């Protein structure tokens, strides 16, 4: 997955996948078996995958799970490069890790026997909370850069913003990006009134005739990183029934809730401040409202820091149905279907910047207000299919196949006045979701071996494909979602067209193992460990803003980026009582 630092507010394909994807936790038993439990059931963790799992138990139970999640990363840095004849050159091994305590499961399942000899033998009601995603992640890297800078990117993307906006007390209520406004406030970008353009404080201004050019002449040390935390949990109300100990049916009303916190930082510092001379340029307003253009004292740029913080609170509702059928004593077949989730997302975000110069009187810092917004989001539907074989009370082998269609993800406004005609603010991102997201396939395999009547060992494996895809276009270029977004109008108008699609080769691979103890009485305990290898993450602190033409073809100077190898380790302990 490729991430670019947020230079403006707005929803993205990455947001849709963050909110829509699941990575099941549940209990230590289900985790230890790789969550290949669609045809197994009998455990509170399995209810979130197949609602029929709650009706398999012949007894009532209460259980809770606790543990920890560790996110690890090994990152490398690549400076900018000319896409005409170069490629990324990653180096360095920056290791990061973060551990958080978790409570992935708690709940109760009540079983009621009917007394019938045939037909419906029992029914159950369960109230459970199962974790379905962890947002724990951290990575960072640093390196030297001598072609591009955050200040240059901010100056480029400020094009069209009036130089007088700095004098407007309501400037954050305008349509201009808050990054650009804050950068102008602190002096990271400056306004050239003669050229009617902005230049970065890390750039040298050259005038040739009536033309101006801006370039970076020195070397910057760049430091950057991302931290995220939070989780998504499904609050489940489950009802099921047991028919002749051969057919188990179940239905869920799921109420997923999530808290997601994300922050990114970027710092750049001049290796030799003498290479970065700068004279600020901006407008001021006196007490009578008269505007005047001011040029500051010549100084040298030392460095700057950029921070972006984002918080989202998410709640939703979906329905789920499933069955488990035993055609013979050893064979079990299961299937479940979950409707798309209707989410409400409430989010807050802000940016913070500071700039330092050799003349300390030019140093400034600025923060945007905290933006608040809410909207609706529709997540994908999910279908699960399972086949299992049990060997009496000695063990079992289970295989699951899960299919999720991410192309149906959709953002929408929370409140719409039907009496007004308006432009859909989410049309662009919804179009990208439909084109560049598709089917994700997930294969899960699990096994359980009962070594003693009271002791079992478990192992599991899962492999999930990427739901993201890319295209080749009529010009022969490979087009990702970010490319289509950049040239959106050209593709939508038919100037360019997409020809053929191919899914990204990224995979999510997990291995797990565990053990379980079941006492002769009511108590039982399970423990499980899982290691997950996530797709490599590519992050750029700012978008490409320089380019040149060779033989009629435009080539970007690709901005610096960080490549991170990501993994997670989970440990879960489940304690339960039957009654």
Question: Across the structure, where does each feature detected by a protein language model lie?
Answer:
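Outer-membrane beta-barrel porins/channels
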Residues: 11-25, 30, 111-579
